[in-house]
Amino acid sequence: MKHIIILGDGMADWPVKSLGDKTLLQYAKTPYMDKLARMGRNGRLITVAEGFHPGSEVANMSVLGYNLPKVYEGRGPLEAASIGVDLQPGEMAMRCNLICVEGEILKNHSSGHISTEEADVLIQYLQEKLGNDRVRFHTGVQYRHLLVIKGGNKELDCTPPHDVPLKPFRPLMVKPLAPEAQETADLVNDLILKSQELLKNHPLNLKRMAEGKDPANSIWPWSPGYRPQMPTFSETFPQVKKGAVISAVDLINGIGYYAGLRRIAVEGATGLYNTNYENKVAAALEALKTDDFVYLHIEASGEAGHEGDIDLKLLTIENLDKRAVGPIYEAVKDWNEPVAIAVLPDHPTPCELRTHTSEPIPFLIWYPGIEPDEVQVYDEVAACNGSYGVLKEDEFIKEFMK
């Protein structure tokens, strides 16, 4: 049997008053997810272990069954792997957002979703002005980039910028968690302030402001770590001889790198509502012909949650159903070799909160011949009655892959 996970980033949500106190999954029209829930089995999964921040790296590693206390090193090293940066012993990687600050306020975490092409100009400029034998900047995708510090100490208290929109930024700057990390914290904070001086009058930002766009006028490094020691997916599940990951997000591709899943680049995959679902689905179906496992990650609903845009998030959920889940199910349901499908988010990203939370997420599993439970629709409430109950750690992936 082949296996595909279809993951709608941040798709779970809280009840919304304007939607009659329904969650977005309850309110959205999702006939295919409802059908698979009805024909399959359902449950909830704890993707954020106690003591961990509800970051996407934590949640997606949990979905894949990784033992977080053993292997977690932060998201910086995962994103480094995704963009081809091979961390050496003693090198610390940090995710480095290009953010927009307005006065003393952190306006948004994405500089108005700056394009990769524009961001590359700014990151190369920062490397030229601030880079040295110890500090390196690397361009990633859109607002998501990388800072590498040789000899950096990862014992740092860093605030993810998407957690604190419209908050004063200075109290949120990096703090050491141990005395030996003070020098690294001071270095990172100095880089933040110097970046603001360098970027505020950069021609690209002046042009963006003239066009009514947010400037990318500060860096914001966070989630530090060293090169992780992770078993590959095939080492955990020997029946998987080949596997693939499809995502527009560096972080997910970095997890895939260490999991031994080949990265499939898809034209038009943006990580936003306008991503090319059709190309991603075509790539997933093509991969399933030769591979045993495919991890199809679609970011759009998570970004809509960060924007607090209820209508946009509803659209992304319905698009996931109509343009990804439906076509994949219709394509594989009659294959000679059966295909198991799982649908789930990695974590909730409630529009009300505009950031991630740690509640268990709803999941469904379907494959030809599975004995269905009593659940009739796919959403956070219905999943509470699923036959799997509440799973944790590697219980979901073991159940799915058996």
Q: What are these language model-derived features?
A:
Residues 1-402:
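Feature captures the catalytic ectodomains and active-site-proximal regions of enzymes
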